[in-house]
Amino acid sequence: MASVNIKPLEDKILVQANEAETTTASGLVIPDTAKEKPQEGTVVAVGEGRVNEQGNRIPVDVKEGDTVIYSKYGGTEIKYAGQEYLILSARDVLAVVSK
């Protein structure tokens, strides 16, 4: 995972999506047009967290390097330095994958 010069704001998270499966369990090749949009990725950068009404910063529950599962249609896709990323709100992250 390369370092990126993008710093998400507040409770936003920068994620690099993991590659979608290219073959089925039985060995059939899945064409690009039939591939599911990936819902798993690696956290590349994390914002400092949002500020509540009392002025306290609430930190984000994930950290750089975490593998996360996120909402299928959440986030904004961006392209930076030839790489594709997703900027997600912390609310779009559904789970952290344990290794």
Swiss-Prot record:
Pfam families: Cpn10. Keywords: Chaperone, Cytoplasm. Its main location: cytoplasm. GO terms for biological process: chaperone cofactor-dependent protein refolding. CDD domains: cpn10. One of its GO terms (cellular component) is cytoplasm. It is found in: Cytoplasm. Together with the chaperonin GroEL, plays an essential role in assisting protein folding. The GroEL-GroES system forms a nano-cage that allows encapsulation of the non-native substrate proteins and provides a physical environment optimized to promote and accelerate protein folding. GroES binds to the apical surface of the GroEL ring, thereby capping the opening of the GroEL channel. Belongs to the GroES chaperonin family. PANTHER family: 10 KDA HEAT SHOCK PROTEIN, CO-CHAPERONIN GROES. This is Co-chaperonin GroES. It comes from Rhodococcus erythropolis (strain PR4 / NBRC 100887). The lineage of its organism: Bacteria, Bacillati, Actinomycetota, Actinomycetes, Mycobacteriales.
